[in-house]
UniProtKB/Swiss-Prot annotation:
Entry note: cofactor: Binds 1 zinc ion.
An example molecular function term from Gene Ontology annotations: RNA endonuclease activity
Cofactor(s) needed: Zn(2+)
EC number: 3.1.-.-
Keyword Transmembrane helix on entry: no
Protein name per its UniProtKB record: Endoribonuclease YbeY
Length: 167
């Protein structure tokens, strides 16, 4: 089971009814089912903040020391490495619960990017959600090899949901 908490700090998000707990759960589940080691976990939790440029700028400055609004920020609850997902998740011990982390999305940046890239707002959000969840479970793009692995997985998941790959 995946429990999703959504907090909306910006009313423009309400215009996008398709962006809801059901969608987020479906995408999260699709990602987690790709890794056998997550099968022993019975309950996952994920927190989503849907906010605006002013708030994301504060968060980006506070946590990354970057004074600029960004499309999305991911805050993993666990220090995972994607390579460990194929072996045992020993840090969980006997627990069958895992808080994946928190993700903050910025409406204005996502809106502007979707217009510039000729995508629907929802499809761009889905791509960023996939990207963020992959960060929460230990994927990164600090070098070309990691970036290729992460991008290929994003493309595979986006294709599953009928969304044209952005790369």
């Amino acid at each position: 089971m995946i429990n999703v908490e959504i907090v909306r700090h910006y009313n423009k998000w309400r215009e996008h009814k398709q962006i809801n707990k059901s969608l987020i759960k479906k995408i999260t589940q699709n990602i987690l089912l790709r890794f056998d080691n997550f099968s022993k976990i019975k309950q996952f939790e994920l927190s989503i903040l849907l906010t605006n440029a002013a708030e994301i700028l504060i968060l980006n400055k506070q946590f990354r020391n970057i004074e600029k609004a960004t499309n999305v920020l991911s805050f993993p609850s666990n220090e995972l490495n994607w390579q460990d997902l194929y072996s045992k998740l020993e840090f969980l011990g006997d627990s069958d619960y895992m808080h994946l982390g928190d993700i903050a999305f910025c409406y204005e940046v996502i809106y502007n990017e979707s217009c510039e890239q000729h995508k629907t707002f929802e499809n761009h959000f889905i791509h960023l959600l996939i990207h963020s969840i992959l960060h929460l479970i230990g994927f990164d793009h600090q070098n070309d090899t990691e970036a290729n692995i992460m991008e290929n997985l994003e493309i595979e998941i986006l294709s599953y949901f009928g969304i044209f790959p952005p790369y």
